């Protein structure tokens, strides 16, 4: 019996790496996995994980694929020796964290290019053949940060909101083609996903006001707490992908955690958005009287409270991993 051919983007670490070796090592031996990476020099960890799980020979191959380059995507497609991809996993992504006014234009453009346009490039390369064959599955790494706004994740959330619209629109179209598309909505995950583009606290302060600077440190402290309490291992998240892949009638969305569903329901129940905005503000920052808000703006210098909240290494701290409820 022919094996199911799976191609996954973004396999140098995290969810992509763990999903690739999970499928390649599946006891059924029913998957042929193409794990793609932007830079093949980073494939060492992938093969270490494959050896640890005793992936059978021929179950896993690596391909160079840079979602920012349509020629690279097309070249990877041509190297799939079976001539087809049964399951496409769009997983490559970038994160971006910080006050909006402190983010560089190039960093903003890079996140949108990888997370949104990069996903479009991959879909454009592989969807037509699935439609012609009348079968196929597409799994896209989403985020609850694509379903609700998170402070200091403005651009990242914008990119994930865009994926929601892209995928939901395609899912409606693809029904009669026999192609199923599902979003895997992740919360915080223990990965090296987040790219810290901010410099020292002083550099951040130079690019924003003192009040926003204090708020950022409050957010970092909250983020670390949520990460400690709720972050999932990528192996656990990979099982949700497998559930979607094997479902007889896959749904549009699969959630890797239920922790954030109450906030999502609140957002849906109140189309005006006011209840969600108030609830999320309290969740992250607590109740701060208006007088204190004004005082923070008028105060001079960051003061000791800024570092006391989250510690002096909060900016760029690898322990932060993904932003709360916004992993991939």
From Swiss-Prot:
Region Disordered, residue ranges: 290-328
Localization per record: Cytoplasm
Residues annotated as catalytic: 156
A matching Pfam family: adh_short
Pathway assigned to this chain's UniProt record: Steroid biosynthesis; estrogen biosynthesis
Top EC group: oxidoreductase
Ligand binding (NADP(+)): 10-38, 66, 160
EC number: 1.1.1.62
Catalytic activity: 17beta-estradiol + NAD(+) = estrone + NADH + H(+); 17beta-estradiol + NADP(+) = estrone + NADPH + H(+)
Transmembrane segments: none
SUPFAM superfamilies from the UniProt entry: NAD(P)-binding Rossmann-fold domains
Keywords: Cytoplasm, Lipid biosynthesis, Lipid metabolism, NADP, Oxidoreductase, Steroid biosynthesis
GO process annotations (BP): estrogen biosynthetic process
Positions that bind substrate: 143
GO cellular component: cytosol
GO molecular function, one term: estradiol 17-beta-dehydrogenase [NAD(P)+] activity
UniProt subunit comment: Homodimer.
UniProt function note: Favors the reduction of estrogens and androgens. Also has 20-alpha-HSD activity. Uses preferentially NADH.
Family: Belongs to the short-chain dehydrogenases/reductases (SDR) family.
Cross-referenced PANTHER family: 17-BETA-HYDROXYSTEROID DEHYDROGENASE TYPE 1 (PTHR43391:SF15), RETINOL DEHYDROGENASE-RELATED (PTHR43391)
Name of this chain's protein: Estradiol 17-beta-dehydrogenase 1
Taxonomic source organism: Pan troglodytes
């Amino acid at each position: 019996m022919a094996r199911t051919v799976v191609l996954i983007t973004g396999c140098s670490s995290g969810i992509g790496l763990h999903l690739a070796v999970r499928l390649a090592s599946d006891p059924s031996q029913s998957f042929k996995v193409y794990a793609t990476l932007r830079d093949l020099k980073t494939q060492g960890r992938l093969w270490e994980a494959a050896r640890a799980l005793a992936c059978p020979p021929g179950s896993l191959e690596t391909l160079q694929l840079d979602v920012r380059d349509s020629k690279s995507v097309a070249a990877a497609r041509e190297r799939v020796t079976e001539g087809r991809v049964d399951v496409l996993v769009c997983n490559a992504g970038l994160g971006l964290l910080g006050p909006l006014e402190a983010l560089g234009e190039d960093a903003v453009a890079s996140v949108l290019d990888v997370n949104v346009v990069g996903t479009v490039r991959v879909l454009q390369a592989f969807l037509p053949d699935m439609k012609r064959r009348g079968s196929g599955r597409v799994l896209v790494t989403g985020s609850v940060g694509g379903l609700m706004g998170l402070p200091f994740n403005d651009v990242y959330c914008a990119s994930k909101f865009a994926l929601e619209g892209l995928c939901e629109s395609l899912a409606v179209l693809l029904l009669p083609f026999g192609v199923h598309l599902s979003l895997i909505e992740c919360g915080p995950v223990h990965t090296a996903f987040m790219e810290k583009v901010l410099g020292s606290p002083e550099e951040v302060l130079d690019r924003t006001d003192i009040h926003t600077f204090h708020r950022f440190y409050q957010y970092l402290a909250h983020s670390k707490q949520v990460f400690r309490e709720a972050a999932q291992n990528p192996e656990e998240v990979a099982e949700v992908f497998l559930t979607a892949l094997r479902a007889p009638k896959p749904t549009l969305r699969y959630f890797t955690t239920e922790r954030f569903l109450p906030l999502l329901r609140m957002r849906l129940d109140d189309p005006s958005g006011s209840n969600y905005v108030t609830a999320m503000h309290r969740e992250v920052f607590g109740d701060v009287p208006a007088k204190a808000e004004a005082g923070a703006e008028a105060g001079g210098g960051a003061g000791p409270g800024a570092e006391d909240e989250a510690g002096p290494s909060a900016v760029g701290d690898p322990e932060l991993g993904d932003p709360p409820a916004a992993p991939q």
